Amino acid sequence: MGQKIHPTGFRLAVSRNWASRWYANNTKFAGMLKEDIEVRDFLKKKLKNASVGRVVIERPARNARITIYSSRPGVVIGKKGEDIELLKAELQRRMGVPVHVNIEEIRKPETDAQLIADSITQQLERRIMFRRAMKRAMQNAMRLGAQGIKIMSSGRLNGIEIARTEWYREGRVPLHTLRADIDYGFSEAETTYGIIGVKVWVYKGDHLGRNDAPVVEEPQDDRRRRPGRPEGRRREGEGRPGGNRRGGAGAGRRAAPGDAKSGE
């Protein structure tokens, strides 16, 4: 199941959180969900060159709080904050409520799955060989601390007639383990031959809970010993030369033929 299901949805409430955090009743849910999708599509097109990894939308008390995670926050903010103000005004017009926009910087873009997928698709659109782009991204991710990475490309690779799928993996990518911190990203490259899809899985270690608390593994002794008797308590006759369990002076030697009882 872990091979097919979406890695983020599989780990919700275990080690991942929702990208849209709000509650609505049955009458308003569909409209708010459609609003979220339109806002994400708008930000994806508007901030195409800003290296946006993910967008979190929250709706507390007739307001909206949008957090944009980007590796290039200066591009989002603009000169003297002009671009961010225009962006906030457009979002308020679309959502109809006061909007607060927060910008969070991604410290290591080489290990962010969505940014890796976007980078590969941009290279494919520039007609760079897909194998070279995939292997370069894998090397950069492993060099900067990722414990495993898997990249899959599907479509008319290199312009061939029949579409195919190729993937490469380096390190460990435990998709079935719920406590594993798996970052997943997907992007599409629009080439002259058609659309090429790129999926990226990045394994960053094991975590427990949404606070990303690392798992502490205690070293285990491989030597398994059977529980012995307490020191100092020994059965009678054990460990002594010529002794047996019942003890006795002559118990350890075989009786000689001449040792028969008198009178026989």
Curated annotation (Swiss-Prot):
Family named by the database record: Belongs to the universal ribosomal protein uS3 family.
Region (Disordered), start-end ranges: 211-264
Biased composition (Gly residues): 240-251
Annotated ranges, domain KH type-2: 39-107
Coiled-coil residue windows: none
SMART domains: KH
One of the record's GO molecular function terms: structural constituent of ribosome
The keyword Lyase belongs to this UniProt entry's keyword annotation: no
GO cellular component terms, A-Z: cytosolic small ribosomal subunit
UniProt xrefs under CDD domains: KH-II_30S_S3
Official protein name in the record: Small ribosomal subunit protein uS3
Subunit architecture: Part of the 30S ribosomal subunit. Forms a tight complex with proteins S10 and S14.
Superkingdom, natural source: Bacteria
An annotated GO BP: translation
